[in-house]
Amino acid sequence: GSAIACGESCFKFKCYTPGCSCSYPICKKD
C-alpha cells in the first residue's frame, strides 16, 4: 500500500521481505 521500496527485486512472484508485495520489478511495502 505504499511507494516505499523494500530493497528486494521480484519477477511477478511473491516477496520474501515481511510486509512487502511485488510491484514488478521491485518489492514495495504493502
From Swiss-Prot:
UniProt cross-references to InterPro entries, sorted A to Z: Cyclotide, Cyclotide_sf
PTM remark: This is a cyclic peptide.
Annotated keywords: Disulfide bond, Knottin, Plant defense
Residues joined by cross-link Cyclopeptide (Gly-Asp): 1-30
Transmembrane helix listed as a keyword: no
GO biological process, one term: defense response
Pfam families: Cyclotide
Keyword Iron carried by entry: no
Disulphide-bridged cysteine pairs: 6-20, 10-22, 15-27
Recorded superkingdom: Eukaryota
Family statement drawn from the similarity comment of this UniProt entry: Belongs to the cyclotide family. Moebuis subfamily.
Entry's free-text remark on domains: The presence of a 'disulfide through disulfide knot' structurally defines this protein as a knottin.
Entry function: Probably participates in a plant defense mechanism (Potential). Binds to and induces leakage in phospholipd membranes, particularly ones containing 1-palmitoyl-2-oleophosphatidylethanolamine (POPE).
Protein name in the entry: Cyclotide mela-5
Lineage, top ranks: Eukaryota, Viridiplantae, Streptophyta, Embryophyta, Tracheophyta
